[in-house]
Amino acid sequence: MERAEFEQAIDEILDSLPDWAVARIENLRVVVEEWPDDEQDPDGDGLLGLYEGISLPDRGLDYVDVMPDTIWIFRQPHLELGLEPEALHEEVRRTVLHELAHYFGLDDEYLDEIGWA
């Protein structure tokens, strides 16, 4: 999957979010990178995505004039999974939704319980 197609898939995933989710998203950017850097993936585990920021439930009254939170989606680790196009698109979707769940305040333990880990 070429980068433009990968980015388009992410745009389509974001465009398909329900209205209740879109209405609550603010000060968030989604960035596609080829690979995570060493700080993002110190163990080199093939990180697919990463949320960096202050989740919605943790934002207080002092949450003003701050840099946007970031969801990083890493293209090459997705491609290295060796999936067929349809399965790859579904994995990208799962990654985007997983990182959005962190933005909404859900932790990995809970996401594992509901099958989103």
Predicted regions and their residues:
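Active-site rim/adjacent substrate-binding subdomains
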Residues: 1-91, 103, 107-112
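Short hydrophobic/aromatic patches at helix-to-coil boundaries
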Residues: 113-117
